[in-house]
């Protein structure tokens, strides 16, 4: 008796690809099995190939003339219907494994996979599994991913604008960290989310602590101390281009300032003999500026240059330089200084402008982490890491929407450097990465992880995806333009959550990086529905087409498009463009003018 699930028989085997001649008795595109209807020959659907004590599983990649084996394309039986199936795994009993131990033989039967078969594969509710959604073709079946491999082997969430990336990320993180109401499955989970557009604060407010440049109600101020990030990148940001000789002198002065600090204050683990400019110790930028500007402007009353022509003493705390009598153009007093001059006055003027620019206060004047002129600070790096990684809530959101684009790459690199170095070197402590792993989620990754980028951010993420597995630090890359992301980073991602991708270059990038060679599934990326994804890689038992579980509407990211027709249908209201200009000048979208009656809080 012919089984109702029979689709056809194997006609050719080539590596992971199998050509299947469809059963002639299939007169319809729909099969009724166990009271349920199944579409036959759908690209992306699963098939089962019985092999005695175990079954092979594959995914339909092609259907029709293009699926006909090359050796048969000129044969007389061109009327046969063919499918190309790509093998992905096998099962023994109820245990499923990726990969195959043997190939099928010619004329082996190929069967449709029923909901019961899928339930056996995806029904494992063992430890370390998190629900991400439901099968697109069988929505009664939950889809789970392996949390261990999702984090330690890294992952990428990719999709065009409007495909549902932000909602997918929010859903994934909620599945891991809980919803703030029911007890979480993973109460010690630790997730750091770099939120470039400020989308996630409302969606994850029950399970996340939010740090923001201009904090709103229930949010914390974001402080990123400049002295804890790379000095070379910091000097480039502050001063622009400086010749190598001057840079060396500046670095020597920074080292001297740090040496003076450790003589008066004890920092555990600091070895004076191994101190460098990049050692994460405080130093005062104001004092550095004052010390560097003075030789550039100093004049003397005597030709021996021993008596400075000082008019008024300056104040480094106020960024006010010493004032001297101007030098003459003739060979007479006051004489210009010729000692320790680096010829960097223009660069120092730029540095002063940066230090006075309010939009950089979160980094250059970082609250309790801002050094006094002698380098002393109220708080140190342990307090900073405690705020970022030791919060009672499992997710920490660093909202970078108020960060100027000129410093974004440098800043993200600095954040990752602080976190990664601490967790790697402290890997065997209870706070380290091996004892309590960390997942770093990077939104809009193409903006700072580009192929041509030479930034600290790209270097740090390359380190994380190459080495992080050993130290308990995982990366989740989120992007709408995978073709612009550095190849090394994308190729190290073990799991891909691919939403709708319309751009051919982006699809090609995904296909080249995927651990499973599934061209048929990749070809379906442009026609995925919003919120629908193809999940493939190490965290997924099988490559699957999945409907991501949507959070409630009041728990979704603030990334939805405005309703143009609805907004334009409203009656015109009185305009007051002083409000957007004030918010712009304050670099704070929540800012409002004193006495304004729009209901928002006053900045």
Q: Where are each of the predicted segments found?
A:
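Conserved AAA+ ATPase small/helical "lid" subdomain
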Residues: 247-270, 523-554
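Conserved P-loop NTPase motor module
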Residues: 303, 310-313, 317-321, 327, ...
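Conserved AAA+ ATPase "SRH/arginine-finger" region at the nucleotide-binding site
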Residues: 212-216, 223-228, 496-505
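Basic- and hydrophobic-enriched, low-structure N-terminal and domain-boundary segments
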Residues: 1-159, 167-168, 172, 178-182, ...
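P-loop NTPase motor domains
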Residues: 198-208, 227-460
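Conserved ATP-driven motor cores of ASCE-family P-loop NTPases powering translocation/secretion/packaging/pilus
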Residues: 240, 457, 463-547
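Hydrophobic residues in beta-strands of the RecA-like P-loop NTPase core, especially within AAA+ ATPase
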Residues: 194, 442, 478-479
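Glycine-rich phosphate-binding loop of nucleotide-binding enzymes
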Residues: 129-214, 487, 535, 565-567, ...
């Amino acid at each position: 008796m012919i089984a109702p699930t029979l689709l056809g028989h194997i006609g050719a085997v080539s590596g992971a690809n199998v050509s299947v001649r469809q059963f002639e008795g299939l007169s319809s595109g729909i099969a009724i099995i166990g009271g349920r209807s199944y579409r036959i020959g759908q690209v992306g659907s699963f098939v089962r190939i019985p092999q005695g004590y175990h079954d092979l599983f594959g995914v339909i990649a092609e259907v029709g003339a293009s699926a006909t084996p090359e050796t048969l394309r000129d044969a007389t039986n061109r009327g046969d219907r063919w499918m190309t199936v790509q093998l992905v795994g096998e099962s023994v009993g109820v245990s499923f494994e990726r990969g195959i131990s043997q190939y099928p033989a010619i004329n082996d039967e190929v069967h449709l996979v029923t909901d019961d078969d899928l339930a056996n594969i995806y029904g494992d509710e063992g430890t370390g599994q998190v629900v991400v959604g439901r099968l697109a073709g069988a929505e009664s079946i939950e889809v789970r991913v392996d949390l261990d491999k999702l984090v330690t082997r890294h992952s990428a969430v990719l999709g065009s604008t409007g495909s549902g990336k932000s909602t997918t990320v929010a859903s994934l993180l909620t599945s891991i960290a809980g919803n703030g109401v029911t007890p979480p499955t993973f109460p010690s989970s630790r997730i750091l989310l770099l939120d470039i557009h400020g989308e996630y604060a409302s969606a994850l407010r029950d399970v996340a602590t939010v740090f923001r440049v201009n904090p709103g109600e229930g949010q914390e101020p974001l402080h990123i101390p400049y002295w804890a990030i790379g000095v070379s990148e910091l000097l480039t940001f502050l001063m622009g281009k400086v010749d190598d000789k001057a840079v060396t002198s500046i670095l020597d002065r920074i080292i001297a300032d740090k040496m003076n600090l450790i003589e008066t204050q004890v920092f555990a683990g600091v070895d004076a003999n191994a101190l460098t400019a990049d050692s994460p110790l405080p130093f005062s930028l104001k004092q550095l500026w004052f010390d560097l500007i003075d030789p550039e402007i100093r004049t003397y009353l005597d030709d021996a240059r021993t008596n400075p022509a000082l008019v008024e003493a300056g104040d480094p705390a106020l960024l006010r330089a010493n004032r001297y009598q101007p030098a003459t153009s003739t060979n007479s007093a006051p004489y210009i200084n010729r000692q320790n001059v680096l010829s960097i006055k223009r660069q120092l003027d730029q540095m002063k402008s940066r230090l006075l620019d309010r939009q950089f206060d979160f980094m250059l004047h970082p609250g309790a982490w801002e050094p006094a002129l002698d380098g002393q600070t109220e708080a140190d790096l342990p307090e900073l890491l405690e705020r970022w990684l030791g919060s009672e809530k499992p997710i920490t959101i660093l909202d970078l929407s108020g960060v100027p684009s000129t410093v974004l790459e440098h800043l993200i690199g600095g954040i990752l450097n602080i976190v990664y170095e601490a967790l790697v070197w402290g890997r065997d402590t209870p706070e380290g990465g091996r004892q309590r792993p960390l997942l770093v989620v990077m939104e809009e990754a193409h903006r700072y992880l580009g192929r041509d980028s030479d930034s600290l951010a790209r270097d740090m993420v390359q380190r994380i995806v190459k080495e992080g597995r050993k130290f308990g630090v995982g990366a989740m890359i989120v992007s709408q333009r995978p073709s612009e992301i550095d190849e090394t980073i994308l190729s190290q991602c073990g799991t891909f959550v691919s939403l709708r991708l319309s751009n051919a270059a982006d699809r090609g990038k995904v296909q080249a990086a995927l651990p499973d060679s599934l061209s048929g599934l990749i070809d379906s990326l442009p026609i995925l529905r919003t919120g629908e994804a193809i999940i493939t890689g190490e965290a997924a038992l099988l490559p699957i087409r999945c409907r991501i579980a949507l959070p409630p509407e009041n728990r979704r990211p603030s990334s939805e498009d405005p309703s143009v027709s609805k907004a334009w249908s409203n009656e015109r209201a009185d305009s007051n463009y002083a409000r957007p200009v004030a918010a712009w000048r304050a670099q704070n979208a929540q800012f409002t003018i004193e006495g304004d009656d729009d209901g928002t809080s006053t900045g």
